[in-house]
Amino acid sequence: MKKRVMILGGDGFCGWPTSLYLSGKGHEILIVDNLSRRNIDNELEASSLTPIQPMGIRLQAWKEVSGQEIRFMNFDVSQHYHRLLTLIREFRPDAIIHFAEQRAAPYSMKSSWHKRYTVNNNLNATNNVLAAVVEAQIDVHIIHLGTMGVYGYGTAGMKIPEGYLKVKMEADEGQTVEQEILYPANPGSIYHMTKTQDQLMFAFYNKNDRVRITDLHQGIVWGTQTENTRMDERLINRFDYDGDYGTVLNRFLMEAAIDYPLSVHGTGGQTRAFINIQDTVRCLEIALESPPEPNERVKIFNQMTETHRVRDLAKLVSELTGAKVDFIPNPRNEADENDLYVANDSFLGHGLKPITLADNLLEEVVDIARRYVDACDTSKIPCSSYWNKEREISQQ
């Protein structure tokens, strides 16, 4: 069934390919974005390796190659509540996909200003969306892109379930009481903390106002292009490699392309969850097609397909490219070593066939990192954000 879908943050790394993918499937798409990610590029003086066109050119290119039109509104959902409310009433979306949050942990830890900006932006955006849906009195399915980081990255000694944990407690009289609760949050940055607070807002609005919500706890996204973004270079997706927004794998690929040692933080024993960008857009489609039933609790999916230790990723990239590996002090306040076992049965049960690093990593090396290598600013690769003063001093 074709749906009206409002995509908040539709100009960003995950939002743009999702917008194209769902538009290509025939859904009516309306993007709302204040272009904050482009403004952060200006602030950091670190742009995408790939050439990102102005929004108007992107939308015109999509119309030319697909015949589909995507509408666009430029405003800040964290600040302009009444514009959001009016738009929801006018557009009457079947679903709202919420990407409109500052997404980088290092950026959220750069300074007190960046911490406050991330909290104000992310929490206000989420609360405004929820409050507007309730005030509009429209049955809208909200799909939120969260993070695996809400669970934390300590070794749990068990497979992390999809959002909810069954616990047993001893009552006063000695009898055992069993409940199912949200998996205990253990954020590792201000950014991750905002995502854990999003969870509580979702739980409340779902319980109090019966808002139908799907929360996707996503792993680190790798890959740049999708079938849609490859259709015209004007549609190309972001490839961030800088120390604030570049994910660990992107940073390794960029370093290898310029013959720079792969910078592994600490021992490289940190285990993280990963997912390819093409699987991300497919997961969003699955979530859109399988909304919660009325009165159903918040539906939580673990949106990841594989886990790897950072040093193993470095070894894989080194074997593909011949790059050397360099171990450097870790700017983050995190465990040097951790295991990570994650349940992801929901998406696999809906037919997701994951793209793995073993399948597509070489393509990413050749098609993106080496092709656009001349656009690289090597001074932006090292991470310049420290989790605390102790970490900063250790780097000096």
Give, region by region, the residue ranges found by the protein language model:
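N-terminal Rossmann-like NAD(P)+-binding domain of SDR-like oxidoreductases, especially those catalyzing
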Residues: 1-224, 386
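C-terminal substrate-binding subdomain of Rossmann-fold SDR/epimerase-dehydratase oxidoreductases
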Residues: 24, 256-396
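Short, solvent-exposed loop/helix junctions and linker helices
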Residues: 8, 119-123, 191, 242-246, ...
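Glycine/proline-rich active-site loop of Rossmann-fold NAD(P)-dependent oxidoreductases
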Residues: 196, 208-211, 223-250, 258-260, ...
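Short-chain dehydrogenase/reductase
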Residues: 126, 130, 202, 249, ...
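Pocket-edge positions in alpha/beta enzyme catalytic cores
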Residues: 75-76, 88, 118, 237-244, ...
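Hydrophobic alpha-helix immediately C-terminal to the catalytic Tyr-X-X-X-Lys motif of short-chain
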Residues: 197, 201, 205, 252, ...
